[in-house]
Structures are given as C-alpha cells and as structure tokens.
A protein has these predicted regions:
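Non-catalytic C-terminal interaction segments of nucleic acid-processing enzymes
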Residues: 1-43, 56-165
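Conserved catalytic cores of phosphodiester-cleaving nucleases, focusing on short active-site segments
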Residues: 46-52
Length: 165
C-alpha cells in the first residue's frame, strides 16, 4: 500500500505519524489532497481526515463551520467516503463516548478578587459540551455519510493503515 499524505498536514503531527509509518514499513508520498489528510492510491474514494482531539472537532463544528461543511459537501459530491480519525486518547473509543466528554474549556474556573471578595469565574461557559458535540457528530454522520473513528496518538499510523486497507 502507498499512502498519499496532504501537504497541508501540520509539520510536527506529520513527523510523528511519518515515524510510525516508517516503523510499519508503509510507503507514502506528500501532495495536496482534494479532501482529508490521508488516502491510499489503491482507493481514491476513501479519505481520512485526522483531528488531534475533540477540542479541534469543536472548533470545526463551531468556529470553522462553513469551511468544514464545504469540505464535507466536496467529499460527498465527489463520491468520497470520509473518515474522521480523532486522536483524543483512550477514554473516547466511539461516537457514543463523546456524549459523556467534559470539555475542559467549559468547566475551567478562575478565582478573582473583586472588591475584596473572591469571585468564581467560569471560562467559556458557553463552550460546547459532550452532549452538544455528540449531537453535531451524529448529524454530520447522517447528513454527509461521514464515519468517525477514534484512537490514541501512539496508534494513529497503524489505524490509518487499517482504515485504508
């Protein structure tokens, strides 16, 4: 198998995955992909879009919604099955696990002294929580035919190879 890697993949992330590919004996080359980050030359209709964690997913769903939606539409119209591989860690193995995820940005508390009194301030109390993100992922899955997979950073290279095989 030869894997095509998008040139826009973040340098430090690519170097980590590149070393995993090297240890697995996977052949690869870099060039711009139509959508996603990884694709096998054996099947141009299957792409993997790697995300570093659920907080990046929140950014795609909320702040970068239009750009992300355009990529989903582009993949669907081209007949490409898009798999989003999220490297969140061992706690999240399925889309269902996302429901119970606690966004650290939502629950971060800072204590300030205001007029001599300690006041609790919640940072980003409007941040997306697991329940909201779960609903968004289910909508994306159902509307655009996207598949969501999860792994740890240590198994990303192996999971990419498995998913593209």
């Amino acid at each position: 198998m030869v894997i095509q890697v998008d040139t826009r993949e973040h340098k430090s992330e690519w170097e980590r995955i590149q070393s995993q590919f090297d240890s697995l004996g996977v052949q690869y080359f870099r060039s711009k992909l139509y959508c996603g980050d990884y694709q096998s030359l054996d099947n141009a209709k299957l792409c993997i879009d790697r995300k570093k964690d659920l907080q990046e997913r929140c950014g795609n769903v909320c702040q970068q919604h239009e750009r992300f939606k355009a990529e989903l539409i582009r993949a669907r119209e081209a007949g490409i099955q898009l798999i989003i591989l999220c490297e969140h860690g061992p706690d999240i193995k399925t889309v269902g696990d996302v429901y119970f995820w606690e966004n650290p940005r939502k629950h971060k508390v800072i204590w300030k002294t205001v007029n001599g009194k300690r006041v609790k301030t919640v940072i980003s109390d409007k941040a997306v929580d697991g329940c909201q993100l779960y609903k968004s992922l289910c909508t994306i899955r159902d509307k655009y035919g996207v598949r969501f997979e999860f792994c740890t950073k240590e198994e990303t290279g192996r999971r990419i190879v498995e998913l593209l095989s």
